A protein has these predicted regions:
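Surface-exposed, charge/polar-rich loops and edge strands
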Residues: 1-58, 69-251
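Phosphate-centric recognition/catalysis
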Residues: 62
Length: 251
């Protein structure tokens, strides 16, 4: 009885040779993403046990060392000057995150303090009015370090009047705008406020947009697709199906 015989059709072989490595690569990429997210969650958990420290007490300028560090800030919000981070959803409702400009008392720096979420007009015709606390405030929060350059749907119009709606928090791009209202130096990373602090709104920070388990699930999907493709390629390029059906009939 003849054994397994192979007969490769070049079009199918070429398509499989292109698709199969891509599917496998996507699976491993998702596993890498899962590992990154797990690392972020572990770093976040470790930071939560630390006591808040003044920004001036943080010796490192390495963004990875600063990420999620708990800080305490003393200063004054610049009245009437705040940013609205657009298209933020909370429990299915459209809104903005409100980012105030806090001039620090102990340095010549100003910090972007993300005060949390507020509902807003889905048509974007009316901007929410969200006054900041007046006078000196002391608050706590954590430093947020962006994982990379934000993706923008179009060029941001970073100019008065205030409040200014933005697509993403890019301190380098926002520095000229902040310089129109203060001579203080803009701190390179925003601070996300803790719940219950002066000026805090609806605070429900999302650590990652997809959990490590979700990325692992995506990886399994890609690997499954690769396995299915390889199996059907083998069926199409050999007499495997005939051998399987023959054995079943003989049984």
């Amino acid at each position: 009885m003849a054994g397994l015989q192979l007969d490769f059709e070049w079009r199918i072989t070429l398509a499989t040779a292109l698709l199969l490595p891509a599917l496998i690569a996507l699976g491993f990429w998702q596993l890498e993403r899962a590992e990154e997210k797990a690392g972020l969650e572990a770093r976040w958990s470790a930071r939560q046990s630390e006591a808040p420290a003044p920004l001036s007490a943080l010796a490192s300028s390495d963004p990875q060392q600063l990420a999620y560090r708990r800080v305490s800030l003393q200063g004054r919000f610049l009245p009437g000057h705040y940013l609205l981070l657009d298209n933020r959803m909370h429990q299915g409702r459209f809104g903005n995150e409100v980012i105030g400009l806090l001039a620090l008392d102990d340095s010549d720096q100003v910090v972007l303090v993300n005060r949390g979420w507020v509902p807003s007009d889905p048509a974007r015709l009316v901007l929410p009015e969200v006054p900041a606390p007046e006078g000196a405030v002391t608050l706590t929060g954590h430093i947020y370090v962006s994982p990379g350059k934000p993706y923008l749907l179009g060029e941001q119009q970073l100019a008065p009047p205030w409040p200014v709606r933005i697509q993403a928090v890019d301190t380098e791009a926002l520095a000229p705008l902040v310089a129109t209202v203060t001579d203080a130096v803009l701190y390179p990373h925003p601070v996300r406020i803790d719940s219950g602090q002066p000026g805090a709104l609806t605070v429900a920070w999302q650590l990652v947009n997809a959990s490590p388990q979700k990325h692992q699930g995506y990886a399994l999907q890609w690997f499954t697709m690769a396995a299915v493709l390889a199996f059907f390629f083998l069926l199409r390029s050999s007499n495997l199906w005939q051998l399987l059906t023959r054995k079943r009939h003989e049984a």
